[in-house]
Curated annotation (Swiss-Prot):
Binding residues for L-saccharopine: R18, K77, Q101, R131, F135, S279, C280, D281
Family label: Belongs to the AlaDH/PNT family.
The organism of origin for this protein: Schizosaccharomyces pombe (strain 972 / ATCC 24843)
Protein name: Saccharopine dehydrogenase [NAD(+), L-lysine-forming]
Pathway annotation: Amino-acid biosynthesis; L-lysine biosynthesis via AAA pathway; L-lysine from L-alpha-aminoadipate (fungal route): step 3/3
Residues carrying Phosphoserine: S85
Length: 368
């Protein structure tokens, strides 16, 4: 049996510092007989020298296009923009084209056009239907952190745009920074901590959002933990307007009643200042938070909700790669969880996780 060849491509999405493989997990695979090739990257949280030190061959950024046909091209976010050329390789990545997202046909059609194959990381599942690896915890953690920073900024710097934000070296430094800003803002809020409503609180993402809130000192009773039992009555929910911060952590798999609308938020005595849509189903027609229509970025983290004229200010965070706020820790956790599935590439035609992923790809291609 020929050892699988994994080719780690450099991410090209602006400010994306995460990596599908880390030096540690790449070595685990190499020790198991895999051939590993690493593209150089100026923005990856793990420096080139960390891979070089372990003896991995390094190749120029973007050279995956010329990789051997049998190499698996592994990455995280979308391929470079403004390129619709056919794809001849097998790609392992988050493609965001299986849930009717805007432009999904253009993204997906590149794979069959070049006789390539897509294994979408979002849909790698175990025998129980649970994702084998996900960034959910760190997405919720980061979304909650930025939400608290935006809340504090509104109180400390009224009428000033929330500034660009950059990744933190580790969780400890992020928690320390957010806690300090919230403490400063308390003086402008009658020493009252914000009330945070987390919907999807029982999942990995929601757990991360609640953990951040707890770690920065927000009292337990100020963190409303909602899940399916609380939302099954159907929205819009007045509890959202009565909270200072709303963090949406659900996994959207079917149409559901709206959690909130511009109309439901445009009411007197609204407390809500910040909405973080961690789920970020911006272009999904079933988005339960239809109060914005653009993805925000680390350079411009928030967007105002148009049509809401009552005070206080209301901003949405809709960054679609929140875990890169903690790129090293989130990458290590994700990559470690992915290792058993990657090891199964040695028997890719029979390993259930890959057989299911290929079948799903073929089903989606039939819809083109």
């Amino acid at each position: 049996m020929v050892a699988p060849h994994l080719w780690l491509r450099a991410e090209t999405k602006p400010l994306e510092e995460r990596s599908a493989l880390t030096p540690r997990t790449a070595k685990i695979l190499a020790d198991a007989g895999f051939q590993i090739t690493i593209e150089r990257s100026s923005q990856r949280a793990f420096k080139d020298k960390e891979f070089e030190r372990l003896g991995f061959p390094m190749v120029p950024e973007g050279s995956w296009r010329h990789a051997p046909k049998d190499a698996y091209i592994i990455g995280l976010k979308e391929l470079p923009e403004n390129d619709n050329s056919p794809l001849k390789h097998t790609h392992i990545q988050f493609a965001h084209c299986y849930k009717n997202q805007e432009g999904w046909r253009e993204v997906l059609s590149r794979f069959p056009a070049g006789n390539g194959l897509l294994y979408d990381l979002e849909f790698l599942q175990d025998d129980n239907g649970r994702r084998v690896a996900a960034f959910g915890y760190h997405a919720g953690f980061a979304g909650s952190a930025i939400s608290c920073l935006v809340w504090a900024h509104q109180l400390l710097h009224p009428n000033k745009q929330f500034p660009a934000i950059r990744p933190f070296p580790n969780e400890k430094s992020l928690v320390r920074h957010v806690a300090r800003q919230v403490r400063l803002a308390l003086k402008k809020n009658n020493n009252q901590y914000p009330r945070i409503l987390v919907i999807g609180a029982l999942g990995r993402c929601g757990t991360g959002a609640c953990d951040l809130a707890s770690k920065i000192g927000i009292p337990f009773d100020n963190i409303l933990r909602w899940d399916i039992n609380e939302t099954k009555k159907g929205g819009p929910f007045t509890e959202i307007t009565e909270s200072d911060i709303f963090v949406n952590c659900i996994y959207l798999s079917m149409p559901i009643p709206k959690f909130c609308t511009v109309e439901s938020l445009n009411v007197p005595n609204r407390k809500l200042r910040v909405v973080c849509d961690v789920s970020c189903d911006t272009t999904n027609p079933n988005n339960p938070i239809p109060i914005y229509n653009v993805n925000t970025t680390f350079d411009h983290p928030t967007v105002e909700v148009k049509g809401v004229t009552t005070p206080p200010p209301l901003e949405v965070i809709s960054i679609d790669h929140l875990p890169t706020l903690l790129p090293r820790e989130s990458s290590e956790a994700f990559s470690e969880a992915l290792i058993p599935s990657l090891l199964a590439l040695k028997d890719v035609d029979n390993a259930p996780v890959w057989v299911r992923a290929k079948k799903l790809y073929e089903t989606m291609v039939q819809k083109l």
